[in-house]
Amino acid sequence: MVRDRVIELFRKALAQGADDGRWPAAGAGFSVEAPRDPKHGDFAVNAAMVLAKQAGRPPRELAQAIVEAVRAADTAGDLAGLEIAGPGFINVRLSPDLWLRTLARAVAEGPDYGRTAVGQGKKVIVEYVSANPTGPMHVGHGRNAVVGDGVQGLLRWAGFDVTREYYVNDYGAQVQTLARSVHLRYQELHGRTVTMPPKSYPGEYVKDIAAGLKAEYGARFLDAPEAEWLTLFRDHAVQHVLGMIRGDLAAVNISFDRWSSEKALYESGTVDRFLRFLEEKDLVYVGKLPPPKSKKGQPPAQPQPDEEGVTAAEDLTLFRSSAYGDEVDRPVKKADGTPTYFCADIAYHWDKRQRADALVDVLGADHGGYVPRLEAAMEALGASRKDLHVVLIQMVSLMRGGESVKMSKRAGTLVSLREVVDEVGRDATRFIFLTRRSDAPLDFDVELAKRQTLDNPVFYVQYGHARLAAIFQKAREAGHAVPDFDLEAARTLASPEEQDLIRRIAAFPDMLAAAALAYEPHRVAFYLQETIAAFHSWYTQGKKSGEKVIGPDPVKTAARLFLCRALKQVLANGLAVLGVSAPDRMESPETRDIADDV
């Protein structure tokens, strides 16, 4: 990375200056950032401002001394200019040849170009999807899956040791409701008339589960008390649904390294051990929740059970989360002594933290209020809040013909993720889920996703990759060998459009590293769209001006072909990070072979 070269030169200069006694040894790190205005150079460095207080010198005066040291360190001539600006920033301009050599690096590193070591092998568990095993995955789950998979992919490219994890909620009330729904369908298959309660699961898959149980057990549980069949029906239903979920995930090419079970946390004694740990650390006590707030002018609100049946009137075992920044203390045990869902959840995070250096949770935006209590739990358990990062996923509106398609798992009319993938394809599904920030709502236009036109974002990027492949096909047909890097030839890449493409290629590793550290895979999709737009513009302009990639000048042709080679590699790598294919052949938007369009 060109940025790495700037960092290397400044570190060398600062170390030499410290050895010579010109300033103290550098303590805190300095930043090297691209300025907002390109007129200010390629990078801005704040080393003088960071070191000024320690050195006891004005920042601008120190900056001048650092500039002289950096110039002395730059024996290869990689820097074209160093200027002092503002309170003491050092603006850096790189030599044209240094930029050009990034093309050679992109081609030499091939499918590994863009990988960095910023993660230093740090172990990270990325937990995503974790949809309740009560039905097939809908489109909202799909966005969580694709964003989570994008996050873990970015972290791998940045040098982290990543474990992909799915947490199966196979213990609570919802899976019991599923089991009871299956039993009703089981009765129905034996000829009885049943009425499905409002909170049951009426989907066709419930009938399939019931049919499997009927085939295996006959009428054995038709009139049996619930205690005899509930656990069996629950476990059978959960395994059936998990099989469906695995299939849905496979349709978008997502798999996991570990499937963790809530039920297993209880059966292994992890939850009980965790509660004892909380008691030993004096992190819990018996008390009542604050009474519910009443509206102004209204009588005091009466305590109502929450989703776990807990009310403010009961004596509960409360976790001291308010001491760590949460709004109130949270119940970890109900009045009857059974653990709450929150208890199992923080026990799970306790378990994860013992297996990794950092945790990433990818959650629906409706869990936003849940984040502070998780952060409080992490801090109370002796970890840092920074060891947990939560990525929130906003809603998806599935659009068809300008109208929203509703999703309702309980009504049995959901539009499943599998249906969308079958209709628009894996690549379109994955890419479109990443065309907006995850914390912003997304309209998924099914008709647009199927369209083979340049207004379809995934088609637009893939078409650019295929166009580059077609350029090389045409070059071979014209007798041009795919060139190796030639610095003299590369110096002919002098147009503003060519220089822009070179800088975009050079920026690719830094972009990936920054996206990984921000947990934002949409940045890669944005980069690809912007970069391919710059390529299409350059290519079209060249055809109009007579400066085609394959032209009469063999030196310029060789340079432009090498630029295209590096760009094609970057596009392929960027698409690979997102789990999207990079085809070499496609039909053009006018339904002719793309080779006719170069």
From Swiss-Prot:
Output the Gene Ontology cellular-component terms.
cytoplasm
Which top-level enzyme class is recorded in the Swiss-Prot or TrEMBL entry?
ligase
> What PROSITE patterns does the record tag this protein with?
AA_TRNA_LIGASE_I (PS00178)
Give the E.C. number(s).
6.1.1.19
Instruction: Please cite one Gene Ontology biological process associated with this protein.
Output: arginyl-tRNA aminoacylation
Q: Does the keyword ATP-binding apply?
A: yes
Q: Which UniProt keywords apply?
A: Aminoacyl-tRNA synthetase, ATP-binding, Cytoplasm, Ligase, Nucleotide-binding, Protein biosynthesis
State whether it acts alone or in a complex, and with which partners, per the record.
Answer: Monomer.
Catalyzed chemical reaction(s): tRNA(Arg) + L-arginine + ATP = L-arginyl-tRNA(Arg) + AMP + diphosphate
Q: Does the keyword tRNA processing apply?
A: no
Q: Where is this region: Disordered?
A: 288-308
Where is the major localization of this protein?
cytoplasm
Q: Where is it localised?
A: Cytoplasm
Q: Where is this motif: 'HIGH' region?
A: 131-141
SUPFAM superfamilies recorded for this chain?
Answer: Anticodon-binding domain of a subclass of class I aminoacyl-tRNA synthetases (SSF47323), Arginyl-tRNA synthetase (ArgRS), N-terminal 'additional' domain (SSF55190), Nucleotidylyl transferase (SSF52374)
The family annotation for this protein states: Belongs to the class-I aminoacyl-tRNA synthetase family.
The coding gene here is argS
**What protein is this chain from?**
Arginine--tRNA ligase
**SMART domains per the record?**
Arg_tRNA_synt_N, DALR_1
Q: Name one GO molecular function term.
A: ATP binding
